[in-house]
Amino acid sequence: MEDYGQPDKLINLIKSMYKDSGGQILHKGKLTDFFAIVTGVRQGCLISPFLFLLAIDWILTRSTGDNTGIQWTLNSQLDDLDYADDLALLSHTRAQMQTKTDKLCENSAMVGLQVNIAKTKVMKSNTTSTEPIQIGNTQLEEVGKFVYLGSTVTQTGGTDEDVKARIYKARHTFANLHKVWSSKNIRVNTKLKIFNSNVKSILLYGSETWFLTKKLESKLQTFINKCLRRILNIFWPEVISNQSLWEKTKQPRISQQIKQRKFRWLGHTLRKDNDSIAKYALKWNPQGKRKRGRPKTTWRRQLTKELEALRLTLRGAESLAQDRRAWRNLVGGLCSATE
């Protein structure tokens, strides 16, 4: 806190809060003996999350910089992605990443924290380097994909692995609620509300950033249709068309719902200040040259086509998004249960 220019009075007050602190654990209705807490922040204290984030910021400020990140804007680089203690370091070269990792471990130790080697992974993209990244004498595991904040990130990019993971998790949740779907005491409308809040929310987590191909759309819609038929107790040889199924359950096509979520996120992002990280990411043009041949369809190119279908450009969408009501009407028109 001294490094951040906080007054001595405030620092001393916080120190006094932590002096001789301890705790007890309630186990089977009984309290354990009092024990001292000599590391970490106080559990349940309102100021604890702030102090922890301050420590993480202190560590990263001293572990990054020096042109070891990836080019982000004309005059700045992106060194890391952080959410609490879930950190993702970014570098162009193996040497830069090793230096950054060494600094992270060193600075973490200075505030009593330690990098979990077992949970730390390395992912390389578009490189021929085979030299490993190490922490001390331990070589970090290299992976082709990893999960960050619930979304699957792969070496080659794309959405396939993330969609596959979301379907798996949603299917598991749907199976755990089998007593709800088979119950004769719960109305269908109530079951559909439970499905939307407990299953569909898991399935569509992070879908705002998906690049949706026809194949992925088919996989998602097939899963949804199976769930809806189970909720309505429609089994073979009984038959119902997909259109009738959607109308009866008042469910939109999955592609339309994902587009609606994407445009809702787009509106929020376009209304942000120009120095917003999310807005930078939306308009970011990565470094490098693309390979010969037909350009690969990306989320950005797909968005451009969707905007063109609405007779909008990204600049025009940004202007329209400033009017929340107008943008809300646009988003509402993208999703129809009977389309």
Residue ranges and their predicted role:
Residues 6-11, 16, 22-45, 49-339:
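Short linear motifs embedded in intrinsically disordered, charge-biased segments
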